[in-house]
Structure formats: structure tokens, C-alpha cells
Amino acid sequence: MEKMYNVGKIVNTHGLIGEIRVIATTDFPEERFQVGNTVYLFEKNSKKPEKLIIRSHRKHKNFDLLMFEGFTGIHQVERMKEGVLKIKEAQLTDLEENEFYFHEIIGCTVVTTDGEELGEITEILTPGANDVWVVKGSDKKEKLIPYIADVVKEININDKKITIEVMEGLLD
């Protein structure tokens, strides 16, 4: 089976006409959830994904509201709650220089410019102006590393290694 990547989690239905409420896990919701695009639904207790074609997409508060072709009522989409939406690897688009997909960053080892290994990136937070990487060290403690030019000095995706410069107070 072709490699697939998460683009959203279905958290609830919305209204009565078959809309679902999605928390996007992609930096490109407008692109991923474009009308006519295909996504794959992985339901909690199902082994096989369901192919869905997006019929409509709109933003509502902090959610993306989606409707799929062939689904016209709440009773048809209630089962989708807690499902995960994915796309195939072939659907990924090329990024600009120094832009990376989350799956490329998660799992990378973080080292300082002095050569000290801090741990592995386990999660990426998106609180606002810049992403924040959660790095778990061998001591099981989490360190938060902002993805900014003053801190992140080199990203080597092939070697899964990221070099950072530790600013004063960053690891305290």
C-alpha cells in the first residue's frame, strides 16, 4: 500500500446536511481540502480506507467544514467521527527551499552547534508566528525549540539531523 499522510481529524458533524468538522493537521488546508480533491478516511475500527471526494469546504471558527460527494445527511456521516483523513504520498506538492513537511521533521535528531545531542523531535506545535518543535531527550524531558533562523542553523533531512544554536535561556 502506498504511503499516506494525515491531513485532518474528524471531530464531529456540523448541522444536518452531511458536513463534518475537521481539525486540520496540514499547513495547507485550502489546498488539501479543495473541491474535487480525494482524501482517504481511516475510521477507528476499519482496516481499509474509504476514498472520499470533497464536495465543499469552508472555514468555521478554528475548524474546516467538509462535505463529500454522495453524502447528503448527518445520518450518513456520523460514523466518521474520530476518523482520520489522509492523502497519498503522490498528492504531496513540492515545497519551497527551506520548507519541510511535518513528517520530514518529526523523528529528526537535534544537536547543538557544540555537538551535544538534545534528543528527537516528537511533535510540532503551531501556536502562531512560528512552529515550535517538541524535542524529547534521553532523560524523557521535553524541550521546546522555536523554528526560527536565530536558533535553527541547519536541517539535513537525508541524515535526519538538525543543528541548533542554543540561545540564552532556551533550554532552562
UniProtKB/Swiss-Prot annotation:
Places the protein is found: Cytoplasm
GO molecular function, one term: ribosome binding
Gene Ontology annotations of biological process type: ribosomal small subunit biogenesis; rRNA processing
Domain of life where this protein originates: Bacteria
Sequence ranges assigned to domain PRC barrel in this UniProt record: 96-170
Oligomer status and interactors: Binds ribosomal protein uS19.
Function: An accessory protein needed during the final step in the assembly of 30S ribosomal subunit, possibly for assembly of the head region. Essential for efficient processing of 16S rRNA. May be needed both before and after RbfA during the maturation of 16S rRNA. It has affinity for free ribosomal 30S subunits but not for 70S ribosomes.
Family: Belongs to the RimM family.
Protein name per UniProt: Ribosome maturation factor RimM
